[in-house]
């Protein structure tokens, strides 16, 4: 369910859909949170970071709660691999990414922050594409009764995506 929020911080759309360019590893990171259902009425939230240059998920976390801690825990996984003044971090305008806490993380690690324009999910197209892929290839035809079942399959799917899944972006090659 969408809950309107008042953004504490907004960044420009620096990436500006430059998806055709060649990027090095850790140069352009895309992120978002998506929802999965399990059990009768339960929800889980997956926060992930896609390294666009390598076309790999470099960090992710599944949680029962969609909150600032979920995103903080995800970005903390990559803090030591960020290239100061070079890494561009693109997200939508979700409350986690417009918070003072996230802005402080970005400033502390000298990250260039970029945000999609309001109502323009295509501005974060490759990340949205990943959500479509994981939901189609892993989730759609499976019923998950527990959080742990879902978590196990997400972990296995991301490993598959990063190491074995052939993609057009990578020239129909299996990732290295």
Where are these regions (language model features)?
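Basic, flexible linker segments flanking DNA-binding modules
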Residues: 1-23, 120, 174-176
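Acidic/histidine-rich, metal-coordinating catalytic segments
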Residues: 83-98, 117, 121, 171-175
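An active-site-proximal beta-strand-loop segment
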Residues: 17-58, 64-65
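RNase H-like polynucleotidyl transferase catalytic core
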Residues: 1, 89-93, 107-126, 142-147
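Short small-residue beta-strand/loop micro-motif enriched in glycine and branched aliphatics
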Residues: 54-60, 113-116, 140-141
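C-terminal domain-tail junction helix/linker
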Residues: 3, 107-111, 133-176
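Active-site beta-loop-alpha junctions of metal-dependent nucleic acid enzymes
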Residues: 42, 60-82
